[in-house]
């Protein structure tokens, strides 16, 4: 931060506090007449409860929301290995990352295009999946030169037994607090379903899907 702001650590602290207070007092988020939504997942369509819920949410979203879906399982998404700061900044200034691949060719352009991102996160071990973690880590190179204040964060999390709140917290700390994505209230839909196909049989699931879809539309699309 200090290097980015051309100051020392204390100067960066004061400047960051000033930016934070300004953002709190003057919320800048504005819905649009047409919005772009990037959906990221690393799941199997045939067995995924998380994807099953997303398909129903998708059906209820306003037609003015343009959707792009990327499956992080398609090809190998190499995780960040912690390049030196100046090297990461150098590649970030070119909209690239040292490790290249799908992250640079497909995902960076999609993130730039998006007004919001929706992460589909099945919970197996109270942690985001390896591919999802790699996406967040590799986003750092782009973040060196691009802030994401004007992009909203949403999530759908399905746990076999418990722990959805832990993954929601990871999304908040990694993408809102660290990467500056805009965080709407109740940004995440959390469900508990163990066996394949169980999510869509949960009591009240259709009502919760409707509520979440309407919330996303309200955040992204300007009322006419």
Place the predicted regions along the sequence by residue:
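A short small-residue
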Residues: 2-3, 116, 189-196
């Amino acid at each position: 931060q200090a290097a980015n702001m051309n100051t020392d650590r204390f100067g960066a602290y004061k400047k960051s506090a000033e930016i934070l207070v300004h953002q709190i007092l003057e919320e800048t988020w504005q819905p649009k007449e047409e919005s772009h939504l990037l959906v990221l997942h690393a799941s199997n369509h045939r067995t995924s409860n998380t994807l099953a819920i997303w398909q129903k949410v998708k059906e209820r979203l306003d037609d003015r929301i343009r959707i792009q879906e990327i499956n992080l399982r398609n090809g190998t998404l190499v995780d960040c290995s912690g390049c030196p700061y100046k090297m990461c900044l150098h590649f970030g200034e070119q909209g690239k990352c040292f490790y290249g691949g799908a992250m640079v060719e497909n995902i960076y352009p999609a993130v730039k295009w998006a007004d919001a991102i929706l992460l589909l996160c099945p919970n197996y071990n109270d942690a985001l999946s390896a591919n999802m973690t790699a996406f967040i880590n590799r986003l750092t190179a782009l973040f060196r030169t691009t802030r994401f204040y004007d992009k909203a964060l949403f999530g759908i999390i399905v746990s076999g037994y418990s722990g959805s709140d832990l993954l929601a917290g990871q999304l908040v700390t990694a993408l809102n607090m660290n990467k500056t994505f805009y965080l709407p209230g109740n940004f995440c839909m959390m469900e508990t379903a163990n066996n394949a196909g169980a999510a869509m049989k949960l009591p009240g699931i259709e009502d919760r899907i409707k509520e979440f879809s309407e919330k996303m539309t309200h955040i992204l699309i300007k009322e006419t």
